[in-house]
């Protein structure tokens, strides 16, 4: 899952070396939180107009997680 998020983000940003993902321990309800960190200059590319790109990233991650019977949440920092 972490590799999928990194691949999605690196496809959008200019500074590919700045893409970092940290993972929190699963919460009580089993939700795994992924924190996506990108360079400040690339933040707009990852979020997109009205958050459309961010929403698409979250949708792809949720779909992939549901195939594994997992719950995920993506936060963009």
Report residues per predicted region.
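Glycine-centered tight-turn and secondary-structure capping sites
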Residues: 47-51
């Amino acid at each position: 899952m972490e590799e999928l998020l990194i691949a999605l983000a690196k496809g959008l940003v200019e500074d590919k070396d700045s893409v970092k993902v940290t993972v929190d321990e699963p919460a009580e309800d089993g939700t795994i939180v992924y924190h996506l960190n990108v360079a400040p200059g690339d933040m707009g590319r990852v979020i997109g107009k009205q958050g459309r790109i961010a929403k698409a990233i979250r949708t792809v991650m949720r779909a992939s997680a549901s195939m594994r019977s997992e719950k995920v949440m993506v936060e963009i920092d």
